Each structure stands twice: as C-alpha cells, then as structure tokens.
Amino acid sequence: MRLLTLEEGTFAVRYARAVIENYLAGKKIVIESYPEVFNEKRGCFCTLHTYPDKELRGCIGIPEPIMPLIEALEEAAISAATKDPRFPPVTLEEMDSIVVEVSILTPPELIKVNHPKEYLEKIKIGRDGLIIEYGFYRGLLLPQVPVEYGWDVEEYLAHLCLKAGLPPDMWLAEGVKIYRFEAQIFEEVEPRGEVIEKKLL
C-alpha cells in the first residue's frame, strides 16, 4: 500500500473540512475529480482540535478498509464533527477556530504472542496504532495518542483497555486480541491554513 503524497494529504484535509462545513450549512458537497488513490479502499480517521489551544473536539473514523477512501473520509469527517458522544456537535461558526487532522490507516493486523507480556516488546510507540477486541468489547487508539500523552507501552495498553470499557490490565487476559496498524497523518497548521504531514518518530 503506497503512502500518500503531501499534495494528496492536503487534498484529504481540505476535503474533510469542506465536507464538514457543507454538512453544517445544510448542503451536500459535490466533487467531480480527485486523486486516484482516493478510490482505493482504506481506513481513515478525522480528528478535530480547537485552535490555538489544541483541545480535542472530535475524533471518529473507519478503521477497516471497507469502502473507497473518498467515502470513508466523508463519513469520518461528518461523524467527528457531529457524532462523537464525548462532545456536543460542532457548529459552523466554530470551524473558524478548529484545525482538521486526517489519518490514513494501513489494514489492522493481529499481533501474535505466546504470552501477553510479549506485547511490551512487539508494540512500538509512534509507529503502532492499536485495536483491542474481547467478546463484544472493542477499543481503538491512533498511534499519535501515546506520543501526545507521553505514555510507555504498558500505559498505552492500559488506556486501550479503558477505551474499550475494560479493566486496564485486561490486555493480560486470555482470549484478548490486539491488532496493530500504522497511520499517515496530515493536519492543518491553523484553521484553513497550510497542511503538513505529522511525523511521530
């Protein structure tokens, strides 16, 4: 799976913003042409932060590559702005003081271990996003999260469990599955401003 160019990443962020602003204004965005890579099935997340204080304002996505990226991006953007249960819906006026971030994901792969303690060696902060599954419980953290909070791998796993509604040490239990994925991250420097690729390592 090839990486996106900065030009394609810039398009992704600009498109996510346009989708949100049109949706909040009661309009449907019509796009006639876009880079070919956006026809590929890829997972993605849209994250909104307040500007300039960078407080989280919404983050939702589609982790699995189940639809063309252009569609996944539209769904993730609208959901991040209006359906994140942690926050009230974003208003159109607020978009003047929000920066948009888009993460393009690699397909999740199961981390195989003989003993759960091996996760501590196999997971790399700044590279790996994680998904935990246990029965009906599921939680996901993007690779930028442990970097932003300064967590080590054990803290990362504990917070992953909490995100899924599980006890923090549940990653040590039998029957738990943990998947990893990588993300290419593009973000606005300021609202509607330059888009850069965010490097975690």
From Swiss-Prot:
Occurrences of domain AMMECR1 (ranges): 7-197
Origin organism lineage: Archaea, Methanobacteriati, Methanobacteriota, Methanomada group, Methanococci
A Pfam family matched in the record: AMMECR1
Gene3D superfamilies: Hypothetical protein ph0010, domain 1, Hypothetical protein ph0010, domain 2
Name the record gives this protein: Protein MJ0810
